[in-house]
Amino acid sequence: MKFGVIVFPGSNCDQDVHYALGSVLGQNVDYLWHGDTSVSGYDCLILPGGFSYGDYLRAGAIARFAPIMPAVIDFARSGGLVLGICNGFQILLEAGLLPGAMMRNACLQFRCQWTCLKVDNNATPFTNRFREGQVVRIPIAHGEGNYYADAATLAQLEANRQIIFRYCSPDGEVTPAANPNGSVGNIAGIINREGNVLGMMPHPERCAEGILGGSDGRELLASIVDWWERGERLGA
């Protein structure tokens, strides 16, 4: 399987993602520069965390207009797998590949900590190694991770099982106390209706080896590989 990690000016998690995919999982992975205009030949694209273009205007607002983004949008709309992590999630929202918007954390502070996430849907290319309802530990590091969507959009996300991760307590209770940023419904990650584009604020690449304090992130990335190697394709 061949991955492309897109590097924007200000990205700072691209090397971690590259290491997790290449060195930990042994996959073929390349860096793609924001100025590239083609993503041909890749099976999965990853938009990593960081502060693309300094987060000026809004997080992800300028990156959405980078030269590579039309190719990313076409890739996603043709069924290609896309994972946006933290700033990558924000870019996917700005690009219209996922519904909703990101606001500043409700506490108005940058939050860097481990979080517990409840897996709400494991029937996706990104979560098939997890059990539905399983609690996983994946860290966050963001100042604008407060996900918002209007009531109609939230109802659609619920009805279509597009909410993939919710912040929760260690025993799986979805409570306000477990919510680090004020996200509506404790939402930590969502998928598009077609099931091929996932955006999440927590960083799976930061917990891909036990030496980092946990390996739940490895299971997410390995889910993509397993799904691909089984020959599964969305809409097939």
UniProtKB/Swiss-Prot annotation:
Query: What positions does UniProt annotate as the active site of this protein?
Result: 86 (nucleophile), 203, 205
Q: Which InterPro entries match?
A: Class_I_gatase-like, PRibForGlyAmidine_synth_PurQ
Q: Which UniProt keywords apply?
A: ATP-binding, Cytoplasm, Glutamine amidotransferase, Hydrolase, Ligase, Nucleotide-binding, Purine biosynthesis
GO CC, alphabetical = cytoplasm
Entry superkingdom: Bacteria
Where is it predominantly found?
Answer: cytoplasm
GO BP field? 'de novo' IMP biosynthetic process
Reaction catalysed? Answer: N(2)-formyl-N(1)-(5-phospho-beta-D-ribosyl)glycinamide + L-glutamine + ATP + H2O = 2-formamido-N(1)-(5-O-phospho-beta-D-ribosyl)acetamidine + L-glutamate + ADP + phosphate + H(+); L-glutamine + H2O = L-glutamate + NH4(+)
Record Pfam families: GATase_5
GO MF annotations, alphabetized: ATP binding; glutaminase activity; phosphoribosylformylglycinamidine synthase activity
- Report domain Glutamine amidotransferase type-1 positions: 3-234
Provide the E.C. number(s) assigned to this enzyme: 6.3.5.3, 3.5.1.2
> Per the database entry, which stretches of residues form a coiled coil?
none
Sorted alphabetically, which CDD domains does this protein's record hold? Answer: GATase1_FGAR_AT
Membrane-crossing ranges are: none
Subcellular localization(s) per the UniProt record = Cytoplasm
User: Quick one: which pathway?
Assistant: Purine metabolism; IMP biosynthesis via de novo pathway; 5-amino-1-(5-phospho-D-ribosyl)imidazole from N(2)-formyl-N(1)-(5-phospho-D-ribosyl)glycinamide: step 1/2
Which SMART domains does the record associate with it? GATase_5
Role noted for this protein: Part of the phosphoribosylformylglycinamidine synthase complex involved in the purines biosynthetic pathway. Catalyzes the ATP-dependent conversion of formylglycinamide ribonucleotide (FGAR) and glutamine to yield formylglycinamidine ribonucleotide (FGAM) and glutamate. The FGAM synthase complex is composed of three subunits. PurQ produces an ammonia molecule by converting glutamine to glutamate. PurL transfers the ammonia molecule to FGAR to form FGAM in an ATP-dependent manner.
Q: Which HAMAP family match?
A: PurQ
What is this protein identified as? Phosphoribosylformylglycinamidine synthase subunit PurQ
**From which organism does this entry originate?**
Moorella thermoacetica (strain ATCC 39073 / JCM 9320)
Q: Which gene encodes it?
A: purQ
